[in-house]
């Protein structure tokens, strides 16, 4: 049995991000469908945010029959609440001609809550992860599904590394605040 099933967390995965194509929500949904089909594992996924992709994502939830697994959370819900109810933060961003993903501050916020992160090697999100999660090839569903299963099976190891990773940013923030006080 998977380690993660023992947890009291409501969601296995969450994404805190504007609902835009480049954030990769659609890839997570497709991956959840594949995992359910191939491993008979129904993972719960919380999506916090709003944006132009909302209706398309809801259509994908229907298409893949993930209604019982996926929750769209109102935008005014604090991200901290979703992080505290979730096990893993996932953002498999894709590069589009119009835009490229920036640093990925949500991944650092999630790490502060002990959430391992799964990101793609697209844009700046690669800098927001170290050994506190998995980096996958952009647009690679097999990579994404394998990363989800790997992190869920080794959740406590990745959670511990996430707390350690987030501490690096706390120290940098304290140093910056100190230097700015002069």
Task: Identify the residue ranges that each predicted region occupies.
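Conserved donor-binding/catalytic core segment of Leloir-type glycosyltransferases
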Residues: 6-23, 29-32
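Acidic donor-binding loop of glycosyltransferase active sites
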Residues: 84-99, 115
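A charged, aromatic-enriched C-terminal amphipathic alpha-helix characteristic of glycosyltransferases
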Residues: 139, 153-182
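A structural motif in glycosyltransferase catalytic domains
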Residues: 13, 28-32, 45, 144, ...
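Active-site donor-binding acidic/aromatic loop of nucleotide-activated sugar
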Residues: 53-56, 66-76, 82
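Short hydrophobic beta-strand element within catalytic cores of glycosyltransferases
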Residues: 107, 112, 116-119
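Conserved acidic donor-binding segment of nucleotide-sugar-dependent glycosyltransferases
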Residues: 121, 131-142, 149-155
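Nucleotide-sugar-dependent
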Residues: 94-108, 126-127
């Amino acid at each position: 049995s998977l380690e993660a099933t023992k947890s009291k967390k409501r969601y296995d995965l969450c994404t805190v991000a504007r609902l835009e194509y480049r954030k990769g929500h659609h890839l997570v949904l497709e991956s959840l469908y594949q995992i359910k089909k191939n491993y008979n594992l129904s993972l719960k996924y919380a999506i916090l945010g709003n944006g132009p992709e909302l209706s398309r994502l809801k259509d994908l939830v229907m298409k893949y029959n993930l209604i019982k697994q996926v929750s769209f959370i109102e935008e005014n819900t604090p991200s901290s609440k979703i992080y505290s109810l979730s096990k893993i933060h996932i953002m498999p961003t894709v590069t589009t001609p119009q835009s490229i993903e920036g640093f990925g501050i949500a991944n650092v916020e999630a790490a502060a809550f002990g959430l391992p992160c799964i990101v793609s090697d697209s844009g700046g999100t690669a800098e927001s992860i170290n050994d506190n999660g998995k980096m996958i090839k952009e647009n690679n569903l097999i990579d994404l599904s394998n990363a989800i299963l790997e992190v869920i099976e080794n959740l406590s190891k990745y959670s511990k590394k996430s707390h350690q990773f987030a501490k690096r940013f706390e120290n940098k923030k304290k140093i910056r605040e100190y230097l700015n006080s002069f």
